[in-house]
Protein backbone atom coordinates (compact mmCIF):
# COMPACT_ATOMS: atom_id res chain seq x y z
CA UNK A 1 0.00 0.00 0.00
CA UNK A 2 1.27 3.47 -0.91
CA UNK A 3 0.30 5.85 1.88
CA UNK A 4 -1.05 9.20 0.67
CA UNK A 5 -2.81 12.10 2.41
CA UNK A 6 -6.60 11.72 2.59
CA UNK A 7 -8.72 13.14 -0.22
CA UNK A 8 -8.82 16.92 0.10
CA UNK A 9 -5.51 17.18 1.99
CA UNK A 10 -1.97 17.76 0.75
CA UNK A 11 1.62 18.09 1.94
CA UNK A 12 3.80 21.18 1.48
CA UNK A 13 7.44 20.41 0.66
CA UNK A 14 10.35 22.67 1.75
CA UNK A 15 10.51 24.99 -1.28
CA UNK A 16 6.74 25.57 -1.29
CA UNK A 17 6.88 26.22 2.47
CA UNK A 18 9.61 28.83 1.93
CA UNK A 19 7.68 30.51 -0.88
CA UNK A 20 4.41 30.67 1.05
CA UNK A 21 6.25 31.87 4.16
CA UNK A 22 7.62 34.70 1.99
CA UNK A 23 4.06 35.66 1.02
CA UNK A 24 2.88 35.52 4.63
CA UNK A 25 5.85 37.52 5.90
CA UNK A 26 5.26 40.29 3.33
CA UNK A 27 1.58 40.45 4.25
CA UNK A 28 2.36 40.64 7.97
CA UNK A 29 4.79 43.50 7.30
CA UNK A 30 2.10 45.45 5.47
CA UNK A 31 -0.51 44.68 8.14
CA UNK A 32 1.91 45.90 10.82
CA UNK A 33 2.61 49.06 8.85
CA UNK A 34 -1.09 49.90 9.07
CA UNK A 35 -1.15 49.33 12.84
CA UNK A 36 -2.56 45.78 12.97
CA UNK A 37 -1.54 43.31 15.69
CA UNK A 38 -1.49 39.56 15.22
CA UNK A 39 -4.02 37.39 17.05
CA UNK A 40 -4.08 33.58 17.23
CA UNK A 41 -7.36 31.80 17.93
CA UNK A 42 -8.09 28.12 18.45
CA UNK A 43 -8.37 25.81 15.45
CA UNK A 44 -11.16 24.00 17.31
CA UNK A 45 -14.30 25.91 18.33
CA UNK A 46 -17.78 25.15 19.55
CA UNK A 47 -19.98 24.49 16.56
CA UNK A 48 -22.35 27.21 17.73
CA UNK A 49 -19.50 29.75 17.63
CA UNK A 50 -18.45 28.72 14.13
CA UNK A 51 -21.96 29.05 12.72
CA UNK A 52 -21.99 32.79 13.58
CA UNK A 53 -25.64 32.95 14.54
CA UNK A 54 -26.72 30.94 11.50
CA UNK A 55 -24.74 32.99 8.94
CA UNK A 56 -22.47 30.00 8.22
CA UNK A 57 -24.11 26.79 7.06
CA UNK A 58 -23.88 23.76 9.33
CA UNK A 59 -22.75 21.62 6.38
CA UNK A 60 -19.71 23.84 5.76
CA UNK A 61 -18.09 22.95 9.09
CA UNK A 62 -15.96 19.82 9.48
CA UNK A 63 -17.28 18.49 12.77
CA UNK A 64 -15.42 16.48 15.38
CA UNK A 65 -16.76 13.70 17.54
CA UNK A 66 -19.30 14.70 20.17
CA UNK A 67 -17.83 16.26 23.27
CA UNK A 68 -19.64 15.88 26.59
CA UNK A 69 -20.08 19.66 26.76
CA UNK A 70 -21.25 20.15 23.17
CA UNK A 71 -20.43 19.73 19.49
CA UNK A 72 -17.00 20.85 18.24
CA UNK A 73 -15.77 21.78 14.77
CA UNK A 74 -12.75 23.01 12.80
CA UNK A 75 -12.95 26.69 11.86
CA UNK A 76 -14.10 27.29 8.25
CA UNK A 77 -12.93 30.93 8.49
CA UNK A 78 -11.38 33.26 11.09
CA UNK A 79 -13.80 36.17 11.41
CA UNK A 80 -16.25 34.42 13.74
CA UNK A 81 -13.48 33.22 16.07
CA UNK A 82 -11.83 36.65 16.20
CA UNK A 83 -15.19 38.34 16.82
CA UNK A 84 -15.80 35.91 19.69
CA UNK A 85 -12.34 36.59 21.16
CA UNK A 86 -12.69 40.37 20.83
CA UNK A 87 -16.06 40.48 22.58
CA UNK A 88 -15.28 37.99 25.35
CA UNK A 89 -11.55 38.49 25.96
CA UNK A 90 -10.77 42.07 24.90
CA UNK A 91 -13.76 43.98 26.26
CA UNK A 92 -11.57 46.34 28.32
CA UNK A 93 -9.23 47.37 25.49
CA UNK A 94 -9.41 50.63 23.59
CA UNK A 95 -11.23 50.88 20.29
CA UNK A 96 -11.03 50.47 17.38
CA UNK A 97 -9.27 47.10 17.44
CA UNK A 98 -6.95 46.34 14.52
CA UNK A 99 -6.21 42.61 14.45
CA UNK A 100 -4.47 40.45 11.84
CA UNK A 101 -3.87 36.73 11.41
CA UNK A 102 -2.42 33.96 9.32
CA UNK A 103 -3.83 30.49 9.82
CA UNK A 104 -5.30 27.40 8.22
CA UNK A 105 -9.05 26.91 7.84
CA UNK A 106 -11.08 23.79 7.03
CA UNK A 107 -14.26 23.44 4.97
CA UNK A 108 -16.46 20.61 3.85
CA UNK A 109 -16.76 20.67 0.05
CA UNK A 110 -20.23 21.01 -1.48
CA UNK A 111 -22.18 17.80 -2.00
CA UNK A 112 -20.88 15.81 -4.96
CA UNK A 113 -17.38 17.33 -4.82
CA UNK A 114 -15.50 14.46 -3.16
CA UNK A 115 -11.75 14.99 -3.21
CA UNK A 116 -11.94 18.78 -3.31
CA UNK A 117 -9.54 20.64 -1.05
CA UNK A 118 -10.51 20.64 2.64
CA UNK A 119 -7.69 22.67 4.17
CA UNK A 120 -6.83 26.23 3.13
CA UNK A 121 -4.32 28.85 4.26
CA UNK A 122 -5.43 32.42 4.84
CA UNK A 123 -4.00 35.73 6.01
CA UNK A 124 -6.17 38.72 6.78
CA UNK A 125 -7.30 41.50 9.10
CA UNK A 126 -10.33 42.49 11.15
CA UNK A 127 -11.03 46.15 11.98
CA UNK A 128 -13.43 45.91 14.92
CA UNK A 129 -15.63 48.51 16.63
CA UNK A 130 -15.19 50.89 13.70
CA UNK A 131 -17.98 51.89 11.34
CA UNK A 132 -18.36 54.41 8.55
CA UNK A 133 -16.72 55.28 5.28
CA UNK A 134 -13.24 55.91 6.73
CA UNK A 135 -13.01 52.34 8.04
CA UNK A 136 -14.31 50.95 4.73
CA UNK A 137 -11.72 52.99 2.83
CA UNK A 138 -8.90 51.86 5.14
CA UNK A 139 -9.66 48.21 4.47
CA UNK A 140 -9.92 48.60 0.69
CA UNK A 141 -6.72 50.66 0.53
CA UNK A 142 -4.97 48.08 2.73
CA UNK A 143 -6.00 45.30 0.32
CA UNK A 144 -4.52 47.32 -2.56
CA UNK A 145 -1.31 48.01 -0.63
CA UNK A 146 -0.86 44.29 0.12
CA UNK A 147 -1.32 43.24 -3.50
CA UNK A 148 1.06 45.94 -4.71
CA UNK A 149 3.72 45.06 -2.11
CA UNK A 150 3.51 41.39 -3.11
CA UNK A 151 3.92 42.32 -6.77
CA UNK A 152 0.81 40.51 -8.00
CA UNK A 153 1.00 41.14 -11.77
CA UNK A 154 -2.69 41.47 -12.69
CA UNK A 155 -5.43 42.06 -10.16
CA UNK A 156 -8.72 43.84 -9.79
CA UNK A 157 -11.03 44.71 -6.92
CA UNK A 158 -14.73 43.87 -7.27
CA UNK A 159 -16.84 45.90 -4.84
CA UNK A 160 -20.49 45.35 -4.00
CA UNK A 161 -22.91 46.38 -1.28
CA UNK A 162 -24.80 43.72 0.66
CA UNK A 163 -27.57 46.13 1.69
CA UNK A 164 -28.19 47.24 -1.89
CA UNK A 165 -28.14 43.65 -3.17
CA UNK A 166 -30.63 42.56 -0.50
CA UNK A 167 -32.88 45.49 -1.44
CA UNK A 168 -32.71 44.50 -5.11
CA UNK A 169 -33.52 40.88 -4.21
CA UNK A 170 -36.44 41.75 -1.93
CA UNK A 171 -39.19 41.29 -4.63
CA UNK A 172 -38.21 37.61 -5.12
CA UNK A 173 -40.11 34.99 -3.07
CA UNK A 174 -37.88 33.11 -0.60
CA UNK A 175 -37.22 29.81 -2.43
CA UNK A 176 -36.45 31.64 -5.66
CA UNK A 177 -34.38 34.28 -3.87
CA UNK A 178 -31.96 31.60 -2.61
CA UNK A 179 -31.61 30.17 -6.11
CA UNK A 180 -30.93 33.60 -7.62
CA UNK A 181 -28.35 34.31 -4.89
CA UNK A 182 -26.58 31.04 -5.65
CA UNK A 183 -26.44 31.82 -9.38
CA UNK A 184 -25.06 35.31 -8.69
CA UNK A 185 -22.41 33.97 -6.31
CA UNK A 186 -21.33 31.29 -8.83
CA UNK A 187 -21.63 33.61 -11.87
CA UNK A 188 -23.93 30.98 -13.39
CA UNK A 189 -25.96 32.92 -15.97
CA UNK A 190 -27.29 29.82 -17.74
CA UNK A 191 -28.98 28.47 -14.61
CA UNK A 192 -30.16 31.96 -13.65
CA UNK A 193 -31.89 32.36 -16.99
CA UNK A 194 -33.68 29.01 -16.69
CA UNK A 195 -35.07 29.33 -13.17
CA UNK A 196 -38.82 29.08 -12.69
CA UNK A 197 -39.87 32.74 -12.41
CA UNK A 198 -43.49 33.59 -11.52
CA UNK A 199 -43.35 36.62 -13.85
CA UNK A 200 -41.28 38.01 -16.71
CA UNK A 201 -40.68 41.11 -14.58
CA UNK A 202 -38.76 39.07 -11.98
CA UNK A 203 -36.75 37.28 -14.66
CA UNK A 204 -35.73 40.63 -16.17
CA UNK A 205 -34.79 41.88 -12.69
CA UNK A 206 -32.60 38.81 -12.09
CA UNK A 207 -30.87 39.30 -15.45
CA UNK A 208 -30.32 42.97 -14.64
CA UNK A 209 -28.83 42.04 -11.26
CA UNK A 210 -26.37 39.75 -13.01
CA UNK A 211 -25.27 42.64 -15.23
CA UNK A 212 -24.80 45.22 -12.47
CA UNK A 213 -21.02 45.22 -12.77
CA UNK A 214 -18.54 47.48 -14.50
CA UNK A 215 -17.52 51.13 -14.30
CA UNK A 216 -18.73 52.56 -10.98
CA UNK A 217 -20.44 55.59 -12.52
CA UNK A 218 -22.29 53.53 -15.13
CA UNK A 219 -23.45 50.90 -12.61
CA UNK A 220 -24.72 53.55 -10.21
CA UNK A 221 -26.69 55.15 -13.07
CA UNK A 222 -28.39 51.78 -13.76
CA UNK A 223 -29.24 51.33 -10.08
CA UNK A 224 -30.74 54.81 -9.91
CA UNK A 225 -33.46 53.63 -12.33
CA UNK A 226 -34.51 50.79 -10.02
CA UNK A 227 -36.81 50.97 -7.05
CA UNK A 228 -34.89 50.72 -3.78
CA UNK A 229 -36.08 50.97 -0.22
CA UNK A 230 -34.81 53.76 2.03
CA UNK A 231 -31.95 51.65 3.39
CA UNK A 232 -30.90 50.74 -0.15
CA UNK A 233 -30.84 54.39 -1.23
CA UNK A 234 -28.73 55.30 1.81
CA UNK A 235 -26.31 52.48 1.00
CA UNK A 236 -25.94 53.76 -2.57
CA UNK A 237 -25.14 57.27 -1.31
CA UNK A 238 -22.51 55.84 1.05
CA UNK A 239 -21.06 53.82 -1.81
CA UNK A 240 -20.72 56.95 -3.95
CA UNK A 241 -18.91 58.74 -1.11
CA UNK A 242 -16.61 55.75 -0.61
CA UNK A 243 -15.67 55.65 -4.30
CA UNK A 244 -14.75 59.35 -4.22
CA UNK A 245 -12.68 58.95 -1.05
CA UNK A 246 -10.73 55.98 -2.42
CA UNK A 247 -9.96 57.69 -5.71
CA UNK A 248 -8.87 60.89 -3.95
CA UNK A 249 -6.60 58.95 -1.56
CA UNK A 250 -4.34 57.36 -4.18
CA UNK A 251 -1.81 58.75 -6.61
CA UNK A 252 -3.07 56.33 -9.27
CA UNK A 253 -6.59 54.93 -9.78
CA UNK A 254 -7.50 51.68 -8.08
CA UNK A 255 -8.23 48.83 -10.56
CA UNK A 256 -11.82 48.68 -9.39
CA UNK A 257 -15.08 47.28 -10.71
CA UNK A 258 -18.38 48.01 -9.02
CA UNK A 259 -20.27 44.71 -8.92
CA UNK A 260 -23.61 44.73 -7.12
CA UNK A 261 -24.05 41.03 -7.87
CA UNK A 262 -21.15 40.17 -5.52
CA UNK A 263 -22.45 37.81 -2.85
CA UNK A 264 -20.14 36.21 -0.30
CA UNK A 265 -20.29 32.60 0.83
CA UNK A 266 -20.90 33.55 4.46
CA UNK A 267 -24.09 35.49 5.14
CA UNK A 268 -23.06 37.87 7.94
CA UNK A 269 -22.21 40.85 5.72
CA UNK A 270 -24.26 44.03 6.10
CA UNK A 271 -22.43 46.68 4.07
CA UNK A 272 -19.73 46.73 1.43
CA UNK A 273 -18.50 43.35 0.20
CA UNK A 274 -15.56 42.81 -2.10
CA UNK A 275 -13.33 40.31 -3.84
CA UNK A 276 -9.78 40.71 -5.12
CA UNK A 277 -9.36 38.80 -8.37
CA UNK A 278 -6.14 37.84 -10.18
CA UNK A 279 -5.46 36.21 -13.53
CA UNK A 280 -2.89 33.67 -14.75
CA UNK A 281 -2.96 32.01 -18.17
CA UNK A 282 -6.62 32.92 -18.69
CA UNK A 283 -7.55 31.42 -15.30
CA UNK A 284 -9.18 33.62 -12.66
CA UNK A 285 -8.14 33.37 -9.01
CA UNK A 286 -10.04 34.74 -6.03
CA UNK A 287 -7.09 36.30 -4.21
CA UNK A 288 -9.14 37.50 -1.27
CA UNK A 289 -12.57 38.53 -0.06
CA UNK A 290 -14.19 40.47 2.74
CA UNK A 291 -16.75 43.01 3.79
CA UNK A 292 -18.58 44.80 6.57
CA UNK A 293 -20.41 42.86 9.29
CA UNK A 294 -22.15 45.19 11.75
CA UNK A 295 -24.29 42.52 13.45
CA UNK A 296 -21.78 39.70 13.95
CA UNK A 297 -20.14 40.95 17.17
CA UNK A 298 -23.57 41.07 18.82
CA UNK A 299 -23.88 37.29 18.35
CA UNK A 300 -21.11 36.78 20.91
CA UNK A 301 -21.87 39.67 23.29
CA UNK A 302 -23.43 38.53 26.61
CA UNK A 303 -26.18 41.14 26.20
CA UNK A 304 -26.43 40.90 22.42
CA UNK A 305 -25.00 44.39 21.88
CA UNK A 306 -24.00 44.89 18.25
CA UNK A 307 -20.87 46.72 17.17
CA UNK A 308 -19.46 47.49 13.72
CA UNK A 309 -16.69 45.51 12.09
CA UNK A 310 -15.05 45.02 8.70
CA UNK A 311 -12.29 42.74 7.47
CA UNK A 312 -10.89 40.56 4.72
CA UNK A 313 -8.90 37.39 4.16
CA UNK A 314 -6.36 36.57 1.47
CA UNK A 315 -6.27 33.07 -0.01
CA UNK A 316 -2.57 32.22 0.18
CA UNK A 317 -2.85 29.40 -2.38
CA UNK A 318 -4.25 31.79 -5.00
CA UNK A 319 -1.67 34.48 -4.26
CA UNK A 320 0.96 31.77 -4.67
CA UNK A 321 -0.51 30.68 -8.02
CA UNK A 322 -0.32 34.24 -9.35
CA UNK A 323 3.32 34.65 -8.24
CA UNK A 324 4.59 31.18 -9.14
CA UNK A 325 5.65 32.02 -12.71
CA UNK A 326 7.30 35.30 -11.73
CA UNK A 327 10.82 35.80 -10.38
CA UNK A 328 9.44 37.38 -7.19
CA UNK A 329 9.21 34.26 -5.02
CA UNK A 330 12.34 32.56 -3.65
CA UNK A 331 13.45 30.03 -6.23
CA UNK A 332 15.39 27.72 -3.90
CA UNK A 333 14.97 26.39 -0.39
CA UNK A 334 17.64 27.67 2.05
CA UNK A 335 20.99 25.95 1.61
CA UNK A 336 23.29 24.62 4.34
CA UNK A 337 26.08 27.08 5.17
CA UNK A 338 28.42 24.54 6.77
CA UNK A 339 28.69 20.75 6.80
CA UNK A 340 30.90 19.52 9.65
CA UNK A 341 32.49 16.11 9.00
CA UNK A 342 34.21 14.19 11.82
CA UNK A 343 36.98 12.11 10.24
CA UNK A 344 37.21 9.59 13.09
CA UNK A 345 35.00 8.38 15.91
CA UNK A 346 37.22 10.25 18.36
CA UNK A 347 36.57 13.52 16.47
CA UNK A 348 32.77 13.38 16.83
CA UNK A 349 32.54 15.41 20.05
CA UNK A 350 34.97 17.99 18.63
CA UNK A 351 32.76 18.23 15.52
CA UNK A 352 29.66 18.95 17.61
CA UNK A 353 31.59 21.64 19.54
CA UNK A 354 32.89 23.21 16.32
CA UNK A 355 29.36 23.27 14.84
CA UNK A 356 27.92 24.91 17.95
CA UNK A 357 30.63 27.57 17.95
CA UNK A 358 29.62 28.46 14.39
CA UNK A 359 25.93 28.67 15.37
CA UNK A 360 26.82 30.86 18.37
CA UNK A 361 28.82 33.27 16.21
CA UNK A 362 25.73 35.46 15.72
CA UNK A 363 25.78 35.14 11.94
CA UNK A 364 22.54 33.11 11.75
CA UNK A 365 24.32 30.21 10.08
CA UNK A 366 22.76 26.89 9.07
CA UNK A 367 25.20 24.23 10.28
CA UNK A 368 24.74 20.46 9.86
CA UNK A 369 26.77 17.49 11.08
CA UNK A 370 27.63 14.60 8.80
CA UNK A 371 26.27 11.55 10.61
CA UNK A 372 28.72 9.05 9.19
CA UNK A 373 28.36 5.91 7.14
CA UNK A 374 29.15 7.61 3.81
CA UNK A 375 32.19 7.64 1.59
CA UNK A 376 33.87 10.91 0.64
CA UNK A 377 32.32 10.62 -2.84
CA UNK A 378 28.85 10.25 -1.34
CA UNK A 379 29.45 13.24 0.94
CA UNK A 380 30.50 15.38 -2.02
CA UNK A 381 27.42 14.30 -3.99
CA UNK A 382 25.24 15.35 -1.03
CA UNK A 383 27.10 18.69 -0.88
CA UNK A 384 26.38 19.41 -4.54
CA UNK A 385 22.71 18.43 -4.35
CA UNK A 386 22.09 20.52 -1.23
CA UNK A 387 24.24 23.52 -2.20
CA UNK A 388 26.40 23.27 0.94
CA UNK A 389 28.61 26.35 0.96
CA UNK A 390 31.53 25.25 3.16
CA UNK A 391 32.93 22.01 4.58
CA UNK A 392 34.91 21.53 7.77
CA UNK A 393 36.76 18.22 8.03
CA UNK A 394 37.43 17.62 11.74
CA UNK A 395 40.47 15.43 12.51
CA UNK A 396 41.10 13.68 15.81
CA UNK A 397 43.92 16.15 16.48
CA UNK A 398 44.95 19.40 14.87
CA UNK A 399 43.10 22.12 13.01
CA UNK A 400 39.97 21.58 10.87
CA UNK A 401 40.42 21.45 7.11
CA UNK A 402 38.10 24.05 5.53
CA UNK A 403 36.76 23.83 1.97
CA UNK A 404 34.73 26.56 0.30
CA UNK A 405 32.32 24.92 -2.17
CA UNK A 406 29.86 27.72 -3.04
CA UNK A 407 30.45 31.35 -2.17
Curated annotation (Swiss-Prot):
Subunit structure: Heteromultimer composed of HisG and HisZ subunits.
Protein's UniProt name: ATP phosphoribosyltransferase regulatory subunit
GO molecular function: histidine-tRNA ligase activity
Record-annotated membrane-spanning stretches: none
UniProt record similarity statement: Belongs to the class-II aminoacyl-tRNA synthetase family. HisZ subfamily.
UniProt keyword Cell wall biogenesis/degradation present: no
A GO cellular-component term linked to this record: cytoplasm
Keyword Cell membrane tagged: no
Remaining remarks: This function is generally fulfilled by the C-terminal part of HisG, which is missing in some bacteria such as this one.
Metabolic or biological pathway: Amino-acid biosynthesis; L-histidine biosynthesis; L-histidine from 5-phospho-alpha-D-ribose 1-diphosphate: step 1/9
Gene that produces this protein: hisZ
Keywords attached to this entry: Amino-acid biosynthesis, Cytoplasm, Histidine biosynthesis
GO biological process, one term: L-histidine biosynthetic process
Protein localization: Cytoplasm
Its job: Required for the first step of histidine biosynthesis. May allow the feedback regulation of ATP phosphoribosyltransferase activity by histidine.
InterPro entries: aa-tRNA-synth_II/BPL/LPL, HisRS-like_core, HisRS/HisZ, HisZ
NCBIfam families: hisZ_biosyn_reg, PRK12292.2-3
